[in-house]
From Swiss-Prot:
Subcellular locations according to the entry: Cytoplasm
SUPFAM superfamilies: Eukaryotic type KH-domain (KH-domain type I), Nucleic acid-binding proteins, Polynucleotide phosphorylase/guanosine pentaphosphate synthase (PNPase/GPSI), domain 3, Ribonuclease PH domain 2-like, Ribosomal protein S5 domain 2-like
Protein name (database record): Polyribonucleotide nucleotidyltransferase
Chief subcellular location: cytoplasm
Chain residues that bind Mg(2+): 488, 494
Catalytic activity: RNA(n+1) + phosphate = RNA(n) + a ribonucleoside 5'-diphosphate
Phylogenetic lineage: Bacteria, Bacillati, Bacillota, Clostridia, Peptostreptococcales
Length: 703
């Protein structure tokens, strides 16, 4: 166990403290990070030996939201935390992405990072705290890690960059940017923005990197004082002799195979070379079974090297495109008859079907997490079935990748979604990947725009997305537009940029090497903007404006305003009144605290009927207005007349007629319909009526 130590630094005007050596003695690295009143405990562990038979680094990252951190008791029967929320999964990915490239190549030991949220201050979001804590826990542990990394959130408030904006500033901010990196370079970018210009986004990323350097320097000081010596590791790599033999036999064949234009044919050709190579060495090597893993590793290295050489030295991509060339695009809308909006977006061999569904405001997603936000009106879900890549495997629920891609596409469209006041509908978009050869998340962005327009949703502008790639080889750099699957897998960067003609709405960047500098970032953003404008032009050829009318199968919504004090009258005891209206008309009714009432249904006649029933409940008598009422009670001094449902007024005996009325029953009886005028509503809300003011005055005879 370490000696108990506390380290502190000023981080954007608030104290960031790191406590080490107090808890979790068995973990390889452990710390508690506190930023204001947000507190996260991070622990990291590793397996003693490498995992056999794998060709990847088995890293797992879990961000655990504990509802006690915000003083809540979980709902449901069990009253305990269940599966991770969408926000927790996205934060786990935020932690994972910048640290994964910084482990040694060939490291096969299992590594786990667990960030547990202990306390949440809404002014200091715990995700950044967890990202910093994960870097610290790995850096002070004996696990080989080429960090540390720092992470920071940047907002744009009134034209100025704000580091780690508080809750009020986040509401005003036109950008939410999370950047992670080392002292030398940027490793990861995640952003949502309100059409922020490309130059401003670049400045924000570089501004964030300056803050990251301060955090890294702080962590380096902690490591110097309490860091453990790194463990000796066994890194997997093929032997020199077998490497040379495989390269001599397979390099030329594989080089030819990777230049096949069509994806499935290219994969078949590469598999054929692999089978030929394995068959050759099965005949020539005595202990062939011991070398299968090495042979496959060398073949993969050959593929990677040959693709990268072709791109960097010959400017030739696997499908023969130029570095900045976008694949052919075609779009179609309205192909699903009963859907409220639908579109297919195809770019090369990547194809996505997007379907838009409109619902009543009661269909919003209810959220129960660590944030103060309670519901979500606009949703985007992304599905990636096995058939989209020509595979056969069981269909499970959405994984972290699907949730991450769906959230990115959702964030890209959010700035152009009309407000509830402009368009009082819940909106759900579903992207079904039909064929995948790279950049499906950005195809989902494009498909979402098209299906929203097809549904008649008055979005503020069209949004398109593009994925950029990077190859650094032999000291040369190539930036690729609209990367396909192989370029993504074998490249050094996956940089997704979505936006309108005027600015960026979402960014997601992952770096597989030791980061990128300003020049490369600037070049990638410029190329991405050119590609985005081209894609928007292709999309406009299919549809460029929202349809003037909603689908006949979409619910119709009528909005009305009532006095908030009358909400209880509309709902009734135990919901009796509103349930009766819903049963009678078949509509949905959603009532806001402000008194806004949204009535939705397919048949407009039923909506109007529900509106009339609600009006009858909430309408107030007005002085000077005439009503046709029914006599409900008779007293010796007058009659009570129900002029509105549940609302009576007094018709005094002296106001029944111009002539003297000796007895009320001489003129009126219970149940009689009578036309009356409201003459007064006193300070206690009592209504006085008159019948005689509506009757012609009798003519007086001359004496």
């Amino acid at each position: 166990m370490f000696e108990h130590k506390i380290f502190k630094m000023d981080f954007a005007g608030r104290e960031l403290s790191v406590e080490i050596g107090k808890i979790c003695e068995m973990a390889s690295g452990s710390c508690i990070v506190r930023y204001s009143d947000s507190m996260v405990m991070v622990n990291t562990t590793k397996s003693a030996k490498p995992r056999d038979g794998i060709d990847f680094f088995p890293l797992s990252v879990d961000y655990e939201e504990k509802l006690y951190s915000v003083g809540k008791i979980p709902g449901g029967f069990l009253k305990r935390e269940g599966k991770p929320s969408e926000k927790a999964i996205l934060t786990s990915r935020l932690i994972d992405r910048p640290i994964r490239p910084l482990f040694p190549k060939g490291f096969r030991n299992d590594v786990q990072v667990v960030a547990t949220v202990l306390s949440v201050d809404q002014d200091c979001t715990p995700d950044i705290v967890a990202m910093i804590g994960s870097s610290i826990a790995l850096s002070i542990s004996d696990i080989p890690f080429n960090g540390p990394t720092g992470s920071v959130c940047v907002g744009l408030v009134d034209g100025a960059f704000v580091v780690n904006p508080n809750a009020e500033q986040r509401e005003k901010s036109s950008m939410h940017l999370v950047v992670s990196g080392t002292k030398e370079a940027i490793m990861m970018v995640e952003a949502g923005a309100d059409e922020v210009p490309d130059e401003v986004m670049l400045d924000a990323i570089l501004f964030a990197h300056q803050e990251i350097k301060k955090i890294v320097e702080f962590i380096e000081g902690i490591v110097a004082e309490v860091g453990k010596e790194k463990m000796p590791v066994e890194l997997y790599h093929a032997g020199e002799e077998i490497t040379q033999l495989v390269r001599e036999f397979a390099t030329d064949k594989m080089k030819k195979a990777v230049q096949t234009f069509e994806k499935l044919e290219r994969m078949e050709n590469m598999d054929r070379v692999k089978e030929e190579t394995l068959a050759h060495f099965e005949e020539t090597l005595e202990d062939f079974e011991d070398f299968v893993g090495d042979i496959e590793e060398v073949l993969q290295d050959i593929i990677k090297e040959e693709v990268r050489k072709l791109i960097v030295h010959e400017n030739v991509r696997p499908d023969n495109r130029k570095l900045e060339e976008i694949r052919p695009i075609w779009c179609e809308t309205g192909m699903i008859p009963r859907a409220h909006g639908s579109a297919i977006f195809t770019r090369g061999q990547t194809q996505v079907l997007n379907v838009a569904t409109l619902g009543a405001l009661g269909d919003v997603q209810k959220l129960d997490g660590l944030d103060e936000e309670e519901n979500k009106r606009y949703m985007h879900h992304y599905n990636f079935p096995a058939y989209s890549v020509g595979e056969a495997r069981p269909s499970r629920g959405p994984g972290r990748r699907e949730i991450g891609h769906g959230a990115l596409a959702e964030r890209a469209l959010l700035p152009v979604i009309p407000s509830q006041e402009e368009f009082p509908y819940a909106i759900r978009l579903v992207s079904e990947v039909l064929s995948s050869n790279g950049s499906t998340s950005q195809a989902s962005v494009c498909g979402s725009t098209l299906s929203l327009l097809d549904a008649g949703v008055p979005i503020k502008d069209m949004v398109a997305g593009i994925a950029m790639g990077l190859i650094k080889h032999d000291g040369k750099v190539a930036v690729l537009s609209d990367i396909q699957g192989m370029e993504d897998h074998l490249g050094d960067m996956d940089f997704k940029v979505a936006g309108t003609e005027y600015g960026i709405t979402a960014i997601q960047m992952d770096i597989k090497i030791d980061g990128i500098d300003k020049e490369i970032l600037q070049r990638a953003l410029k190329q991405a903007k050119e590609g985005r404008i081209h894609i928007l032009g292709e999309m406009r050829k299919t549809i460029s404006q929202p349809k003037p009318e909603l689908s006949p199968y979409a619910p119709k919504i009528v909005k009305m305003q009532i006095n908030p004090d009358k909400i209880k009258d509309v709902i009734g005891p135990g919901g009796k009144i509103i349930t009766k209206i819903i049963d009678e008309t078949g509509v949905k009714i959603d009532i806001e605290q402000t008194g806004e009432v949204f009535i939705s249904g397919i048949e407009i006649d039923m909506i109007k009927k529900a509106q009339e029933l609600i009006n009858n409940i909430v309408v107030e008598p007005e002085v000077g207005k005439t009503y046709k009422g029914k006599v409900s009670r008779i007293m010796n001094f007058g009659a009570f007349v129900e002029i509105l449902p549940g609302k009576e007024g007094l018709l005094h005996i002296s106001h029944i007629a111009h002539e003297r009325v000796a007895k009320v029953e001489d003129v009126l009886n219970i149940g009689d319909e009578v036309e009356v005028k409201v003459t007064e509503i006193d300070e206690k809300g009592r209504v006085n009526l008159s019948r005689k003011v509506l009757l012609p005055k009798p003519e007086h005879k001359n004496k």
